[in-house]
């Protein structure tokens, strides 16, 4: 091995592969963009902090990779970032480029703001009924957005004298879900709400990752 590489005698020791944390908030201090119910356009990778001491401590415990997720304050949260734990690296160097893209969803108490206090319960939804409707409204809009861009891409010549469809970063992320390019990681509490999300996914033809 190179001279600057530490060699450890593993005789009599137990060796395991590096651990992977599938749901982490390490290296990201701002994880909840909770000002509205849908924030699919925000990205955890934009706020990664490679100097977070948690990275060093997790490496010491055998963790080598983590799925950094948006928080669970809203029904459709932000986009994830899968990172390799590299202490001393830059934020961009943490990103694992071969990972499937993901996004955080949440159901139940967090998103309907249970026990937040009367001063902090002004955002829709406030019930599980509303959570379902948020999802259905969002994916209905995403389907329409998908159709507009599909029509434009199939025959762009007809758009020469027209303005192309306006880009919407929020809806783009949802279209990626519909097209199987982005996995959903959903925080949930109860069986009934899990079944609700399953029904919505069946109606719109997408799958839930976790």
Where are these regions (language model features)?
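Histidine-rich, glycine-flanked metal-binding segment
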Residues: 1-16
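Divalent metal-coordination and catalytic microenvironments
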Residues: 12, 23, 58, 197
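Protease-associated
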Residues: 16-17, 29, 176
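Histidine-centered catalytic micro-motifs
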Residues: 20-28
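Feature captures the catalytic cores and cofactor-binding loops of soluble hydro-lyases/lyases
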Residues: 29, 34-38, 196-199
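Proteins synthesized as precursors that undergo proteolytic processing into mature forms
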Residues: 33-56, 60
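Polyanionic/metal-chelating signatures
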Residues: 59-207
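Extracellular/periplasmic bilobed ligand-binding domains
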Residues: 210
């Amino acid at each position: 091995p190179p001279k600057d590489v530490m060699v450890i005698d593993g005789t009599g020791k137990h060796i395991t592969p590096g651990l992977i944390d599938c749901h982490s908030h390490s290296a990201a201090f701002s994880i909840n963009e909770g000002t509205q119910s849908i924030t699919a356009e925000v990205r955890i990778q934009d706020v990664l902090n490679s100097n977070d001491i948690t990275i060093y401590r997790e490496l010491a415990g055998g963790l080598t990779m983590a799925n950094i997720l948006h928080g669970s304050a809203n029904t459709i949260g932000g986009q994830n970032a899968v990172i390799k734990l590299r202490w001393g690296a830059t934020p961009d160097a943490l990103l694992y480029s071969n990972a499937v893209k993901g996004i955080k969803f949440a159901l139940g108490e967090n998103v309907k703001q249970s026990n937040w206090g009367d001063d902090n319960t002004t955002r829709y939804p406030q019930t599980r009924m509303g959570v379902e409707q948020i999802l259905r409204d969002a994916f209905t809009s995403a389907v329409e957005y998908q159709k507009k861009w599909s029509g434009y891409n199939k025959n762009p010549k007809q758009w020469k004298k027209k303005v192309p469809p306006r880009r919407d970063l929020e809806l783009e992320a949802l279209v990626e879900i519909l097209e199987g390019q982005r996995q959903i990681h959903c925080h949930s509490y109860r069986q009934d709400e899990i079944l609700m999300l399953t029904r919505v996914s069946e109606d719109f033809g997408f799958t839930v990752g976790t």
